[in-house]
Amino acid sequence: MKKKKRLIYLCIELVVFAAFISWHYIQLKIEEPLRAPLGQLVEADGHHMSVYSEGAGDKTLVFLSGSETTSPILDFKSLYSLLSDEYKIVVVERFGYGFSDVVDKPRDIASVLSDTRAALAAADISGPYVLCPHSLSGLETFYCAQLYPEEVEAIVGLDMAVP
């Protein structure tokens, strides 16, 4: 009798588990359009990097996210949506964030800057830029301004880290 009850409970558990798995796959199919990249995926150092742009102003604002910003495009949306009528807005998602690839390579300031510049070039976005760094990307911005002053028109810090 006990074995029969255990078998019944096990069958019920398996049916419930299968129902949850089926529901999960159905929801994934329904949500598939929501997982499409919001910007364009460009190649930088052999990997895909996400670059989002909108607006058509004369000046280009490039938003750079800090550490641990999982989706920079969505994170900055409340700000850039107010500015896109007057400026060209660009949001670069670093490797490992948003829709960009996760890579296994050094993430020092020089390589992050190199990847950002490569992504901007691949997306056909030319300077000079108004860089809008948040948090840790402030270090990358100062490094960029030192190495490539002709590419930086201005820096507008968004609670950025400074050396």
What are these regions (language model features)?
Residues H47-F99:
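Conserved HGGG/HGGXW glycine-rich cap/lid loop of the alpha/beta-hydrolase fold
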Residues R94-C132:
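Active-site loop/oxyanion-hole signature of alpha/beta-hydrolase fold enzymes
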Residues D75, L79, V112-T116, S137:
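Stable alpha-helical elements in mature extracytoplasmic
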Residues K2-L61, D85-Y87:
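Alpha/beta-hydrolase fold catalytic core
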Residues S126-P163:
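Conserved hydrolase catalytic core segment
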Residues S78-L82, P106-D108, Y148-P149:
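Glycine-rich, phosphate-binding/catalytic loops in enzymes
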